[in-house]
A protein has these predicted regions:
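Alpha-helix boundary/capping residues
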Residues: 8, 47-50, 128-132
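Internal alpha-helical scaffold of NAD(P)-dependent oxidoreductase catalytic cores
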Residues: 14-120
Length: 137
């Protein structure tokens, strides 16, 4: 089975329309078992032809999926609770601390599932959140 992760800043501009709102965008995909199958090679070639975009083949797509989920689950959980955009988490300590706690909890869940996430994932994701351009979220 092939898994994939898309990294993009986007919004739903209107029904059935996803708008890329800024910043880089890329896609990472790979076999869940880490193999480089013929099917994955064909998909990679077809994807590049069909989209004009070069995808990234990962031998550890489960890690990629979890590392994105660590950030998304933390930021979306906190912003849903406070009913404010992403930037509010970095502007107010009472929002930032639960965000960091959520990152740590999601990281721990990945580790409990046997996924090898980067050792400094919490620091990487907090730096990413701090560095976001306000127009990108």
């Amino acid at each position: 089975m092939v898994g994939g992760v898309v990294y993009i800043f986007s919004t739903i501009g209107e029904p059935d329309v996803i708008e890329h709102t800024g910043g880089p965008a890329w896609i990472v995909y790979g076999e869940l078992d880490g193999n480089r199958s013929d099917r994955l090679k064909r998909f990679h070639e077809h994807f590049a032809r069909a989209t004009g975009m070069e995808g990234v083949v990962s031998e550890s797509i489960r890690t990629e999926l979890w590392e994105k989920s660590v950030f998304i689950s933390a930021i979306s959980g906190v912003t849903a609770a406070i009913r404010l955009p992403d930037g509010a988490t970095r502007d107010e300590k009472s929002f930032w601390d639960p965000f960091v706690d959520s990152l740590e909890e999601a990281r721990d869940a990945a580790i409990a599932e046997g996924v090898q996430v980067t050792d400094d994932i919490v620091e990487e994701r907090t730096a990413f959140a701090r560095d976001l351009d306000p127009g990108m979220y």
